[in-house]
């Protein structure tokens, strides 16, 4: 295992176009879970997440769990990456650093009514 692992948390997702766990019309969905530091037994628990959005109206959160075989309800919010006011479209890039020996990490999207989440990557 390399010292740093880079993973796609969420591939490009555009409102109205079905891709991955997004059906093209839902206002809320979760990405697939990906392995965090805790899965590999890393002791530092440092994660960095990069997010790019274009004309987004919605909320994007990072969630994690310490459970090895989690149910959807086992995930907790770690950070809110971007949150629009429901009418103003946001175009920006974000970096989030957080520490925790999370076994699994995922992205939770809600209030998604327009725009694109260009991609979300994680390094740990």
Residue map of PLM features:
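Short edge beta-strand/loop segments characteristic of extracellular beta-sandwich folds
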Residues: 48-52
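Short proline/glycine-enriched turn/loop motifs at strand-loop junctions of beta-rich domains
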Residues: 54-59, 112
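Transition segment at domain starts
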Residues: 1-43
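Short, surface-exposed beta-strand/strand-loop-strand elements in extracellular ectodomains
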Residues: 57-78, 119-123
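Beta-sandwich interaction modules
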Residues: 27-30, 34-44, 77-124
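Residue-level detector of short, conserved catalytic/binding motifs and their immediate flanks
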Residues: 47, 60, 105
């Amino acid at each position: 295992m390399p010292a740093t692992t880079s993973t796609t948390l969420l591939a490009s997702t555009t409102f109205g176009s079905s891709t991955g766990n997004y059906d093209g019309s839902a206002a809320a969905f979760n990405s697939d879970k990906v392995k965090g530091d805790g899965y590999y037994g890393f002791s530092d628990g440092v994660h960095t997440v990069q997010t790019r959005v274009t004309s987004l109206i919605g909320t994007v959160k990072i969630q994690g769990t310490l459970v090895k075989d989690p149910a959807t309800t086992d995930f907790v919010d770690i950070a809110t990456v971007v949150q629009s006011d429901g009418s103003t479209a946001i175009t920006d890039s974000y970096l989030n650093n957080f520490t925790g020996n999370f076994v699994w990490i995922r992205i939770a999207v809600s209030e998604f009514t327009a725009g694109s989440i260009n991609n979300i990557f994680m390094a740990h």
